């Protein structure tokens, strides 16, 4: 009799364990893509402290950061991220910020750009470095910021007959081609620098942005799009690399560039910076795509490629939008809580992050850690709303 009771108890306990396990799995699924679950709040502060400790150890003697040596772009991203950490942590690490700012200032050029000696990706580096200076002390670095604004406005495509470049900025100083990512980074810098919405730079940008939008309403005569509200990388659709996510086939067999996460978030953010209202059909179309494709597990349509830059763009866009939740069908996501938990779960023991799927330099721990600190700062602000 005693033996039968023991067996029964064991079976009952096993059944309970299975029920708990299934409940935990369901909760995990809901937290990744569904509504709030009452899970423990992510320890954002602790994660940031560990990440800052890593960056202290990783800073080069010249004040810069980067796995391949100091770089203006990576250093700018680190400084911009550190500018937003909790004030007490920031004060304890003021020396890191001071050294980083000195490194940025040491790389100013006469044309207003801020770039390493190799002169590569001048627009991208200038946009990032200038935003870092704005975040630290706008008035103190006003002359440098003003010079960078003039430089950036000067490299925007201004020939209306050049559909590949008009209204956009690319990686470098040339005016041969532009893309949604570099244009968005530059426009964000111009917005933070206070460039008037009446400036022609925004009007030209709107033309470029409309050409990257997968919307038949925005498309020029004879141009077919995926018409899903998302965005692509370039404004000219019949070239290789028009979308980082490749192409899709329309019902009539026509291949068109596929929308993907980073481009669509960049589009929405840029439309808002350029002055377009939230209730505008173009803005609503982009936001609907974002809601429909919401996830914190991957970069929509690109999997793990560029995952951390996607997070970096995601938080800037959604914080600008201002809603702490996203609706996806019947599910309601607390995106800041879910994203913070996901980022923290990926942090390494030394406080850093890297992406095993090395694309766009995401094997560099200083770069990716800057993305993550910035993203966690944004999540924290939204959770405090």
Task: Name each model-derived stretch.
Residues 19-21:
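C-terminal motif of bacterial Sec signal peptides marking the signal peptidase cleavage site
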Residues 27-50, 64-96, 110-150, 155-207, ...:
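An alpha-helical repeat/solenoid feature that recognizes helix-turn-helix modules
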């Amino acid at each position: 009799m005693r033996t039968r009771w023991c067996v029964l108890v064991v079976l009952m306990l096993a059944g309970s364990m299975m029920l708990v396990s299934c409940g935990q799995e369901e909760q995990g699924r809901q937290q990744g893509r569904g509504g709030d679950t009452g899970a423990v709040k992510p320890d954002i502060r602790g994660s940031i402290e560990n990440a800052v400790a890593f960056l202290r150890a990783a800073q080069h003697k010249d004040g810069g950061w980067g796995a391949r040596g100091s770089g203006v772009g990576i250093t700018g991203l680190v400084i911009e991220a550190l500018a937003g950490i909790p004030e007490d942590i920031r004060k304890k690490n003021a020396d890191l910020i001071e050294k980083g700012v000195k490194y940025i200032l040491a790389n100013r050029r006469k044309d207003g750009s801020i770039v390493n000696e190799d002169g590569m990706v001048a627009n991208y580096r200038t946009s990032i470095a200038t935003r870092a200076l704005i975040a630290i002390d706008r008035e103190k670095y006003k002359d440098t910021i003003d010079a960078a604004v003039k430089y950036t406005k000067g490299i925007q495509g201004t020939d209306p007959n050049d559909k590949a470049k008009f209204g956009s900025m690319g990686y470098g100083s040339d005016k041969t081609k532009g893309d949604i990512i570099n244009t968005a980074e530059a426009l964000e810098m111009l917005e933070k620098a206070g460039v008037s919405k009446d400036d022609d730079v925004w009007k030209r940008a709107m033309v470029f942005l409309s050409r990257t939008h997968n919307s038949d309403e925005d498309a020029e005569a004879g141009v077919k799009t995926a018409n899903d509200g998302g965005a692509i990388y370039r404004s000219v659709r019949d070239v290789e690399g028009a979308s980082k996510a490749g192409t899709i086939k329309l019902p009539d067999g026509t291949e068109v560039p596929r929308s993907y996460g980073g481009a669509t978030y960049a589009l929405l953010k840029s439309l808002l910076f350029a002055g377009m209202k939230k209730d505008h059909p173009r803005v609503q179309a982009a936001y609907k795509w974002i809601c429909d494709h919401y996830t914190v597990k991957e970069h929509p349509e690109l999997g793990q490629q560029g995952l951390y830059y996607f997070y970096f763009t995601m938080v800037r866009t959604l914080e600008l939008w201002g809603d702490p939740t996203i609706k996806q069908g019947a599910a309601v996501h607390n995106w800041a809580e879910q994203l913070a938990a996901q980022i923290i779960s990926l942090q390494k023991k030394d406080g850093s992050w890297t992406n095993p799927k090395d694309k766009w330099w995401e094997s560099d721990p200083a770069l990716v850690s800057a993305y993550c600190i910035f993203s966690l700062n944004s999540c924290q602000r939204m959770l405090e709303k």
